[in-house]
Amino acid sequence: MQIEYYNIFIDFDFKNLKYSGIEKIKLNVDDELVLDAEGIEVTSVKINGNNINFAKRENSISIPLGKFTGEIEVDFQAKVRDDLVGIYVAPYGDSYMVSTQFESSHARKFIPCVDNPAYKAEFKLSVKVDEDLDVISNTPVERIVRDGNRKIIEFMKTPRMSTYLLYLGIGKFEVNYDFSSSPIVGVITTPGKISRSDIPKQFGRQFISFYENYFGVKYPLPKEDLIAVPEFAFGAMENWGAITFRETALLADKTSSLRQTMRVAEVIAHELAHQWFGDLVTMKWWDDLWLNESFATFMSYKAVNTIKPEWDYWGQFVLDETAGAMLKDSLHITHPIEAKVEKIEDIEQIFDDISYGKGASILRMIEAYLGEEDFRKGIRSYLEQYKYSNAKGENLWKSLKDASGKPVDRIMESWIKQEGYPLITVSINGSKVKLEQKRFMQDGSTDEKTYLIPITIEINGKRTEMLLDEKNKEIDVGTDIKSLKVNLNKAGFYRVKYADLNRVSEMNGLEKFGLVNDYFYLLLAKQVTFQEYEKVIRSMLKEYNYLPVREIADQLYFLFLVNKEKYGGLALEFHKSQLEIWATKTDPLSRLTYASLVENMVMMDNDFAKDLSKEYTRLDSVDPNLKDAVVMAYAASGGERVYDEILNAYRTQKFDEEKQRYLKALLSFREGHLVVNTLSLSFTGDIKKQDIVRILPLASSNPYTRGAVWTWLKTYIDFPRKSLAGTGIFGRVLSDTLPLLGIGRVEEVKKFFSLHPIPEAEKGIEQGMEMLEIISNLI
């Protein structure tokens, strides 16, 4: 079967949130045609104006066409949804917009279609709305036809693309366009938000230019809209030519924190990378989702690092992508990067740290092994060969192998099709180095898996590269080994354990990050003692590189959350030592590091929080990077007396960046009933559905109120579950929430979920419980 085009007319009733549609589909088919249609009433199917029979099935219709080439017409009607997928309503203030979210399999909730990424087609969309409404789609407006107090907006035809990339937005918008070159780049917001659009507009222009140059393929559409949606389940979505974002992932200005501006840059870069990897070339089926997400993640860091070198974005990469992926992939509940997807309901479960962070980290490892030029040459060849069509992982390996002459296919087979990653133990005997690999498991177990590992090793100052394809390998350098280090620049996706830390050579920031990250998770796996771990930490009490400092601070803060009596002393000692170093530094990464240390201290030290809370009276003049910490401190030290003040400030903020600041503070109170009151704001709509994703993990990380939060979750778990139904996100929320929330009550949590199973979140619950049991060993 092949589909040539969908010609879609939508008559939209914005007031009553419903619509009717007439759709003409040109295709050729050899047998029965099945159109996916969920929550849509199909009223007729016609050929040449004549009604033909069709059968309604659950979430689809079947049309007995036999061998057919031509055009069919489908008439249908449907209501706008409220569950953040398909075509849905996104409220803001006293108004709303209508937006769409079709990835992975939700286009069927808007129009009858073959909702499968392999069946690409051109789309021609026309929408009839009231005169005062604006409409956005993937392409520019071709013409507008007035009809009394209504109008029909006809959009230009799209290139061939998958159904999940179609977009429709309806409402009242403000726009900020850059017409300086092709394509036109615009930021679109709901009324009153456009003042924070200049920075994202500039990023959009810069990243499109970067990708056109890197990929050697011009951006193929006339325009690129970056659309801020006030209620959005995910971070962003790469609809071709009409990218949607939650407001905190798109909007920023000079008053924004560096963390906010960096996030905006990264998310824009990620979604724009998809315009080539995902939109121009699309995976054949969701098994290869990682082809889209891993590449967009990897390329976004490369793009940001090029545009903003002062942000050291490869450092951010190991902090934000590699570290999280290595944790999740060391659990028993994980999956290969190339995950088998047989049912559409399984698709949402693989939008996770493996498909994004691990896949991107493997690409970084492969680029380091091939060299940047050969890697880029292979990518360009792949895009040229498969543009406007679909591809599989092996197609990419072949392109990279042909460009480099290296066995990329063999290496990727090892890393993509099996889960997990290795621990490499390094020992020295005279002139010999012994490398031993075994799969690293966070609970201390292992199995017989081996990996084909591109190893970088420096011995006595001399760099060596090799492929380790066996369990044990011995290297004789012919002279006594005085110093060495393995995994240069933390480019490899593996952990390293040294038999003798005293002979480890001098390390850069990335390598120090790798060392402290590896030793923390070796501690959790009971493969090093706390004394060995503490020795590594104490060697860095006066460390001046932000990467190991940020990592150690996060580790010690985590240990504080697990057991403040046991680990609080070391955590406070490290933070106080580091605060002195970073307090007066003014470069961007130093301010970010200092802010991270200060936020941790607010939750660890009541006196510190009380002192910092005094800054709240002059919040407008506080460093934007410290505002989160100041508001948290005001809440944490003020207690019940200031709760209503913080809540009112949360409710009255215009921009989501500030709303998130106050929401975080509302979950930082030391009093359990106040935090629970905040969680219950989600019942009234005070907290958006999209933010349920955030509030439960945040509440679980408040060590003073966990008992109250657990009681609330047991009582009201059906509310967040129903709010996020269909998005596939609730499992991830529980995976992130249970490890800390369940501390001290492992059996109770286990019993609760055995009595109240949540099938769509089963994997996330199992991951969370596995991590909870590992953490409990630290108590």
Region roles according to the model:
Residues 1-223, 248, 253, 324-327, ...:
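Acidic/His-enriched low-complexity segments
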Residues 7-12, 282, 643-649:
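General secondary-structure propensity
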Residues 37, 268, 666:
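Small/polar loops that bind or transfer phosphate-bearing groups
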Residues 49, 56-59, 112-121, 192-200, ...:
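Noncatalytic linker/hinge segments flanking ATPase motor cores
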Residues 93, 178-182, 243-244, 330-332, ...:
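Short alpha-helical hairpin
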Residues 126-129, 134, 145, 151, ...:
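Non-catalytic accessory/interaction domains
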Residues 155, 187-444, 558, 569-578, ...:
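Hydrophobic alpha-helical and helix-loop surface patches within well-folded domains
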